[in-house]
Amino acid sequence: MPGDRLRRIVAELSDGEGSWAAARLCEVCPRIAGVEGAGVMLMSGDLPGGSLCTSNDVSQLIEELQYTLGEGPCIDAYQQDTVVSEPDLADPETVRWFAFTPPALRAGVRAVFGFPLRVGTVRLGALNLYRDRPGPLGAEQHADALVLADVTARWVLETQAGAADGVVAKALELKANFHFAVHNAAGIVSVQEDISVTEALIRLRAFAYGNDRLLEDVAQDVIARRLRLG
């Protein structure tokens, strides 16, 4: 029954006192969904805004790759507002993300799944799941992931509703990476090259992609004055 599934998942997410946080979500989610790892990506417009949490180093890399390259399961799930399933990244007949797939495979990722986070008409991002072996999610795992995405979206909205305008709720920041360094670096490049911040972000992404680096690492070099674009 749907209600039983919801109660079971909420109970697993709870800390025993009726509350839970993003860190516990990404800790418990892989066990519930039967996968190796999970991550929650929040979006800003049609672009990745940052990760709310990740369950392990590989999940963190998946989020970083999507943020750097602008493609991947979370981005498609959000933009298309539907579940995205790629059960075998190594299958040459079904290459969906030409930039994302090679480094993901090198990290040991064989299957990825994206579930949109939304409450009514409000879209927030996507829940990302990955496996180190090929194959689709089972029917029960898929149903559990849908509930996880729904519960996560509602929790994010409810938590942020209690924060002041323009301020991220502290409960959302605990395990998050909102890539503040990238925004700082974009500001620096904007001043150095006399361009808009938007154009600076585009150049940072292009440099990261062209040099096979993560955007966060490039940003840190710009901030430390080890790198100047232009």
Predicted regions and their residues:
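Short beta-strand-to-loop transition segments that serve as allosteric relay/switch motifs
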Residues: 89, 126-135, 140
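Short hydrophobic beta-strand micro-motif common in sensory/regulatory domains
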Residues: 111-118
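Intrinsically disordered, low-complexity terminal regulatory regions
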Residues: 1-69, 221-230
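Allosteric cytosolic regulatory segments
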Residues: 142-153
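Signal-transducing coiled-coil/dimerization helices and immediately adjacent hinge/linker segments
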Residues: 161-229
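Regulatory sensory and allosteric helical modules in signal-transduction proteins
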Residues: 43, 59-96, 105-110
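Short hydrophobic/aromatic beta-strand element in the GNAT-like acyltransferase core
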Residues: 101, 114, 126
